[in-house]
């Protein structure tokens, strides 16, 4: 993330990747036999994306929703002592956009029966704790990441 001439993490040799294509809302990205559905879901930045894909456990299919960029930034000082460059009005607009993204994501989850919630930030979905539960899993026990549609709704509401 760049803030004008500075960069968010104060990396001396920041190399910005070259954009080779853009991804559209609702696009399916195909990787061999695997398909990842893309959902535009503005949150802390306008380009935030959610992803959905199928996984299998013990021969049973499950639908994952991977939510990225949830939350909003308000005015203040952030890591690296950078001041957030926008006003309270911007933060309110951002919060309304974020709320719309939450509703859109939930509607997708209901329609597609998502039963696994992931987040690219492990602490925002108890990923490490859930993985520990799975390590102790006995044959025939449900995968701890499979939380059902209501469990997915809870994570979306709490984020």
Regions found by a protein language model. Name each.
Residues 44, 48, 121-123:
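Histidine-centered divalent metal-coordination motifs
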